[in-house]
Amino acid sequence: MKTLLSTCISIFISFHFLAQASTYNLTVKVSGIEVKKGMVEYGLFRDAEKFTKIGGTYRMIRVKVDASEETVTFHNLPKGKYAVCIYLDENNNDQCDKNFFGIPTERFAFSNNLRPLLSAPSFEACSIYLNENKSIIIRADY
């Protein structure tokens, strides 16, 4: 009985460590923040269909703007493709304000530092493949 219990505990511990080893961290630094007020919202996406859609984030982090650079880390992410979209919520109203034509009036940026011309970039163009701990920089200086 002791052997069976020891074996079960060993298997459980092994699976626990394997599960932890297959997750990674993504650190995202936003640089070039000119207006030091409001919040930076980091949206992490895993699904191309939900990319840039309200409620489509896999995870989200909001931090108060205190400096020209802000950094957050998304922890325990499974291996796969991700894309990041950030916006600077200067008036702290929990939404990306837009003008009459639907164009954001608050600063925003995407992973891979893609700059949209007439529409948001695709998930594929912004995607990052995560198979190890990674750090990326997104420039908000436009």
For each feature predicted by the language model, list its residue ranges.
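Bacterial Sec-dependent N-terminal signal peptides
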Residues: 1-23
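A short, amphipathic beta-strand motif
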Residues: 24-32
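Short, ordered, surface-exposed loop/turn motifs in non-cytosolic proteins
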Residues: 35-45, 50-52
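Short proline/glycine- and polar residue-rich coil/turn motifs
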Residues: 63-68, 130
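Short, flexible loop/turn segments at beta-strand junctions in immunoglobulin-like
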Residues: 74-77
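A short tyrosine-centered beta-strand micro-motif
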Residues: 82-86
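Acidic, glycine-anchored loop motifs typical of Ca2+
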Residues: 90-97
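Extracellular beta-sheet/turn segments enriched in Thr/Pro/Gly and aliphatic residues
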Residues: 106-142
